[in-house]
């Protein structure tokens, strides 16, 4: 039985990466690409879209919800 090889693109640089145990940083091609991406999330350069945070300055009250 032939095992199917899955190839994905590194989300940081676009390099082809084999999806499997031989690629410990998957989906990234390297530790460097993984850490650059992590830094972008930590610096809030990347975010998952959603509703804005509610804070006291937004005029929020418990009566609204």
Curated annotation (Swiss-Prot):
**Which prosthetic group or cofactor does it need?**
Zn(2+)
Q: Which InterPro entries match?
A: DNA_gyrase_inhibitor_YacG, Znf_NHR/GATA
Kindly give the Pfam families that the UniProt entry links to this protein.
YacG
Q: Where is this region: Disordered?
A: 45-65
Q: Where does Zn(2+) bind?
A: 10, 13, 29, 33
Q: Name one GO biological process term.
A: regulation of DNA-templated transcription
Protein name, as recorded:
DNA gyrase inhibitor YacG
Describe its assembly.
Interacts with GyrB.
Similarity field: Belongs to the DNA gyrase inhibitor YacG family.
The family database entries (HAMAP family) matched by this protein are listed as: DNA_gyrase_inhibitor_YacG
Please give the NCBIfam families that the UniProt record associates with this protein: PRK00418.1
Organism of origin is Vibrio cholerae serotype O1 (strain ATCC 39315 / El Tor Inaba N16961)
How many cofactors are bound and how? Binds 1 zinc ion.
According to its UniProt entry, what is the function of this protein?
Inhibits all the catalytic activities of DNA gyrase by preventing its interaction with DNA. Acts by binding directly to the C-terminal domain of GyrB, which probably disrupts DNA binding by the gyrase.
Spell out the SUPFAM superfamilies in the cross-references.
Answer: Glucocorticoid receptor-like (DNA-binding domain)
- What domain of life is recorded for the organism? Bacteria
Acidic residues composition-biased segments? 55-65
* GO molecular function (one): zinc ion binding
């Amino acid at each position: 039985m032939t095992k199917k090889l899955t190839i994905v693109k590194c989300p940081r640089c676009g390099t082809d990466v084999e999806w499997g145990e031989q690629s410990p940083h998957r989906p990234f091609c390297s530790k460097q690409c993984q850490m650059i991406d992590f830094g972008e999330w930590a610096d809030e350069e990347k975010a998952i879209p959603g509703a804005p945070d509610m804070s006291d300055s937004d005029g929020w009250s418990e009566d609204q919800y």
